[in-house]
Amino acid sequence: MSRKVRAPRGTDLHCKGWQQEGPMRMLMNNLDPEVAEKPEELIVYGGSGKAARNWEAFDAIVKSLQELEDDETLLVQSGKPVGVFKTHSQAPRVLIANSLLVPSWADWDQFRELEKQGLTMYGQMTAGSWIYIGTQGILQGTYETFGAAADKHYNGDLSGKFVLTAGLGGMGGAQPLAVTMNNGVVLCVEVDRERIERRIDYQYLDKMAENLDEALELVDEAVSEKKPLSIGLLGNAASIYPELVKRGRIPDMVTDQTSAHDILNGYVPADLDFPYALELRHQDPEKYMKLSKSSIAKHVEAMLEFQKQGAIVFDYGNNIRQQAYIEGITKAFDFPGFVPAYIRPQFCEGKGPFRWVALSGDPEDIYRTDRLILEEFSDNEHLCRWIKMAGEQVSFQGLPSRICWLGYGERARFGKLINDLVAKGEIKAPIVIGRDHLDCGSVASPNRETEGMKDGSDAIADWPILNALINTAAGAHWVSVHHGGGVGIGYSLHAGIVVMADGSKDAEERLERVLTSDPGTGIIRHVDAGYELAKKTASEQGVNIPMWS
């Protein structure tokens, strides 16, 4: 019988204080059946991204947090608690390192062998750092991406446009709602029926189609009426994409969010019955990976053909181009990644995916923060529109939460305002504030966040380490450094932070420091790379950068 984990609700503590209760509840929330993709295996999202190495380690982490003092710090090594040290009251309560390998050993083969020996785990980004909030966690970023694409190519609106994509897992599941929020029509190919049904249950997806003909009828009707609609097609992208090319059905926009970063535990090859594919993963992994590579090559060839015939095509951060390139598709990088194509200007302003979670479990606490945004940021029409749409259309998974993109200065201001509401009792329990590792200054990923940097610094990995170090010094409640998130082992290093608003003076000081230094590293990283918008932001915000003026 599989274990079911759910974070406690309310104000009763199970630890010695909220500084310990917060990470404990968020670890548990990552494994809530409403949140995690495979909670019985400790897998949260992203193929095999886990919250803890095994159930024994999970129990030991919980016990350690329950016993942790206010001047101690717990160390977690790839999902396993390995030490508790006396530090001080304003230090982080938890420091996490996940999936890190010495560079020459940093590939999937080495990683899987070490994982098999029980020595490591794959933490993805927010799985092993205990700040995953379900599909909403990537929703605004996806909304912003499709919105930026609409601005660039279609005068700011996807009305009457046919968007093709694939993958409805924890990350890809945000795509259908993000497209319809931008008024488009989207066909999402997904091989797993349960994932399609899950997205419908949580109102991220409108309809399911059993075959391509049925799906295209729905697409054509919605496009002709310029009516937003999302359709989940049960099928394999490596079969459906080439079939659409063969039929001459060229979408307006094409991307993909299958788990191509992991050709064993993520991607599913074409022409295999889904249950059999899952068996083959374990029975003959080498054969499975060979089939995955072949399917990815066909998948990307079809995307290139769509581009050749006039579609807007972009990589959505799953490293599918790299996998295809390795398999001999030499033009795989002819279509761009989403960050250089659409998102980098926001990074230059210190903007990124800012999220917060109500530890009380009461949705009213999140609704109060929604009103706070509308009250205090009323001059930001784009942000207010997002908050209103999220309030109307986003279903909570696990502990109630919200996400929006805020920039340098805005994050610290909002953090203080939330802390004030907790202090006044207008919010019932502390609010946890964190972000995705996909942020302006916290990641080095040459095929994704740092692709095509102006100065050629795509692979420079000092920046996420500096981000983690300054946020530790600034007093984030927990800080994490990971390897391989999003694009797979060997292709990225990245850092995460979480800081809590518990209404105290201590929290106010931490929030001011952390929510300034964290986006600040994004500004300095982009100034250093020569981006004029980042220089303008640094000048306006008074960011201290020694060798630049």
UniProtKB/Swiss-Prot annotation:
Binds 1 NAD(+) per subunit. InterPro entries: Urocanase (IPR055351), Urocanase-like (IPR023637), Urocanase_C (IPR035401), Urocanase_central_sf (IPR038364), Urocanase_CS (IPR023636), Urocanase_N (IPR035400), Urocanase_Rossmann-like (IPR035085), Urocanase_sf (IPR036190). It is found in: Cytoplasm. GO terms for molecular function: urocanate hydratase activity. The active site is at 404. PROSITE patterns: UROCANASE (PS01233). GO terms for cellular component: cytoplasm. Pfam families: Urocanase, Urocanase_C, Urocanase_N. It catalyses: 4-imidazolone-5-propanoate = trans-urocanate + H2O. Keywords: Cytoplasm, Histidine metabolism, Lyase, NAD. It is an enzyme of class 4 (lyase). NAD(+) binds at residues 46-47, 124, 170-172, 190, 195, 236-237, 257-261, 267-268, 316, 486. Its EC number is 4.2.1.49. Pathway: Amino-acid degradation; L-histidine degradation into L-glutamate; N-formimidoyl-L-glutamate from L-histidine: step 2/3. The keyword NAD applies. It comes from the Bacteria. GO terms for biological process: L-histidine catabolic process to glutamate and formamide; L-histidine catabolic process to glutamate and formate. Its cofactor is NAD(+). The keyword Cell division does not apply. HAMAP family: HutU. Belongs to the urocanase family. Catalyzes the conversion of urocanate to 4-imidazolone-5-propionate. This is Urocanate hydratase. The gene is hutU.
